Amino acid sequence: MNRRHLLKAFAASAPLLASTSLVAAPKQDWRTLAQDVRTQMAWAWRNYVERCFGQDQIKPVSGRAEPFFFPGGPPLGLSIIEALDTLYVMGLDAEAEEGIRWIANNLNFDIDGEVQVFETGIRIVGGLLSGWHGTKEKRLLALARDMADRLSPAFTKSPTGMPYRFVNLRTGAVRDPVSNPAEIGTYIAEWGTLSKATGDKRYYDMAKRAMQVLFDRRSKIDLVADTINIETGAWVSRRASIGPPSDSYFEYLWDGWQLFGDVDFKRMYDVHTAAIVKYQAQQSGGHLWFPQVDFETGVVLDHHQSELAAFYAGLLAQGGDMARGKAYLASWADVQAKFGVLPEGYDYARAAAERVTNELRPEFVDSCLNLFLLEPDDRYRELARLHYEMMKTSSRAAYGFTIIDDITTAPMKQGDLCPGYWWSEQMKYYWLLFSDADRFDYKNNYLSTEGNVFVGLK
């Protein structure tokens, strides 16, 4: 199927979610499609193993390695760790064992270098925990705890309990107090899971305290801005957004309730969500969007939508607002129909791409999966199928799948990077949507903001 045919298919699919009178999705052979996803995953993995095994990321056009944590320093095998539970749930057991052997023989966090606490938490700690959940390899749990301990000074050295952005893995030295909601409030899933696994409540408590302190600094209209000084607790900006750098804070408020039954998280989620719906939800051209607003007045600041904000459709549905969740997914489905591949940034007031790159983002398909888990219906699968087919058409390169530098050119101009999260998120979401996977519990499950499965692997 070429790009023109795919765009026609996208356009035909746009009404699928446009109203509550839903149109049935076209008949598809989902199991065959799932096997294709598995085949593509295995092919990409083999290229990574042959070209740069153990390196953080692969550049699929050139076949070279790309560091993530320490440019010029030791890699942490990021792509291996991100891929572990995806390989497991797909039944690619030889590949998973290959990754575990590399981790057991090579991974060592005693490095005199600093890491970003947020990224390391969701990617390394989270990836090791989900790998442990699937494979039961005790070494993975021990490494997850080791890394969490090395990140802990970011919390314990903070006068407020909100973490610093960077920490040295060997010395515990911390840096950069000017942070944001996502980097402050996206730990409870990983840290809480670690507390349950080890019996050590310290991890849960430090993650919860950071979120509570941030929540307590909300404005009088119950919104948070996107930049704050964690030492003083003073806001540095007035911009409120459901997108980055605030997005996963809202996600983890719900997740703290879903995973651990902690009513404090449910209360905080409800307070913020009511304010977001009141001050940020906006209809434009028949679509639901969430503009950036002043967090103290609710005045609209701009109409930019980051592709990362597409996750919010699934979160709204999980939180009980299925109607708005469907409506927001429909808005993004129309953007997908317009461009074929979602742009990194979209201005809904101008109906134009603000950022023409595509970073192999998974958030749209993440929402398709979350809605599918709540309401199994092939319309969500169909939107994800179109997303997958276009990824194959536009992003497949000699040695894997790559980002796109410009989605508006014909053909689309490829970049040269496969982000670590591609292994953890995008391919897993496709597989779970298309396969009826026998290693996944579709009734009782939990996936983190990085797509790591902490509950539900069989």
Task: Tell me what each language-model feature is.
Residues 23-458:
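Glycan-recognition and catalytic cores of secretory/periplasmic carbohydrate-active enzymes
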